[in-house]
Amino acid sequence: MADNKTENALSSDATEVRAQKLKLLREQIGDVYPAHFHRTMTNAELGAKYESLEPDVETQDVVTVAGRVYSSRNSGMFMDIHDASGKIQIFSHKDVTGEEARALLPMIDIGDIIGVTGVVRRTKRGELTINAQKIEMLTKSLLPMPEKWHGLSDIELRYRKRHLDIMTNEDSKLRFQQRSKIVSGIRRFMENDGFMEVETPMLQSIYGGATAEPFKTHHNTLKLDMYLRIAPELFLKRTLVSGLTDKVFEINRNFRNEGVSTRHNPEFTMMECYWAYADYEDMMDLVERLFEALALSIHGTTEFDFGDKRLSFKGPFKRVPMPDAVKEATGIDFLTIKTDEEARAAAKAAGFAVEKDWTWGECLAFIFEEKVEATLIQPSHVTHFPKDISPFAKEVPGEPRLVERFETYCNAWELGNAFSELNDPEEQRRRMVEQLEQAHARGEKEKQLDEEFLDAIDQGMPPAGGLGIGVDRLIMLLTNAPSIRDVILFPARRNKAD
């Protein structure tokens, strides 16, 4: 819960003064919140155009800019205004500024948005400045701003009042600008690689494509219970069956009614794609090319810092089969273990607390999570997953207990998950029925078999590689963000009263 003292500091007697000024402004100038204002350039464009202007030089160029007032000195003689691109200094003086504009100065507070027209100059100290001839009030702010150089120190308040966080925290602002660049970069990379972007339903009458608890709602007209999707997988595969394209992808939100942590948000962004006539090794190459391109676009190099670690997105990444990784970490050779009972016994003998009904594959995956995940700091592909936990992947030739699946890890986080996709309709049905029975045994009575998907697979899906990438976690790494809530503009949070 946010500190009430911190929040109360944003509401003081200053609000009364601002309200009084607003009343006076309405009387004096009429519309304090005009519908339109024409500026001739942004602050960044201004800075770029006059980058070579020497100190103590005044031009004859008249420009019009707009922005929020971040600082005011000498009774408004000097003001810094910021737009989304940067800041510019405004100078007001009786020798250059009209009487009407100077009369407005006492009514301007930190946080107000103003428009300024004037002549460009650079001061003796080298500060690019506009000598204000005309000043217009565009938005009167009724609340004081947090102090620019300290921002919001209360973390929960930063998430709840993200507008103030970005307004006063350059790191936060840059991170969300980079997020936009990364998402655009993913889309551009996929399109340049020949993938077609599609949009699949967010509301689904049958949820599937992953094992997770869904959010449930109800469609009144259709008289139908529906679910926010937990994954787009089944619809994207149906698109592949259709022949619309051989390479399909989607960037969109998934929803899972589960826990919240520094790496989990109930609403999160995924990039999921399917590539006909490819397999999981092709998807590994795709991941490496994509990650390298994104690192270069953000950092100009494939190496970058995350916390105290130096990470490299330069391919090829390390590739290790899960049974080999577990054997190296624990000495347990799962490939020589024949039965579920033997697997549970071996795990218990090594000190792992496993459930009495766990299968060979569940024991292998659990020990991997306990002993290996935390060691995967540099980007790595973990391959050869147990079939028990991978219902949509093809078997590894010669080892029917394992499938052609990999997960990409970095900083001990799972970033991506990919398969050589199962397209045998009889085997697909058998595995989905088995998965459904397991879900019902866990008490998930609403889980249903997606017959429309199975009908599409019966029609014939080409061999394909499939991949899902957690976009938020990837952005965390690329922007050095310690929490997923630092890269989601408005993350899930408790109500203020809680």
UniProtKB/Swiss-Prot annotation:
GO molecular function: ATP binding; lysine-tRNA ligase activity; magnesium ion binding; tRNA binding
Keyword Transcription (UniProt): no
Reactions it catalyzes: tRNA(Lys) + L-lysine + ATP = L-lysyl-tRNA(Lys) + AMP + diphosphate
Pfam family, one: tRNA_anti-codon
EC number: 6.1.1.6
Cofactor(s) of this protein: Mg(2+)
Binding site for Mg(2+) 1: 407, 414
Annotated cofactor note: Binds 3 Mg(2+) ions per subunit.
Signal sequence bounds: none
Protein name according to UniProt: Lysine--tRNA ligase
Organism lineage string: Bacteria, Pseudomonadati, Pseudomonadota, Alphaproteobacteria, Hyphomicrobiales
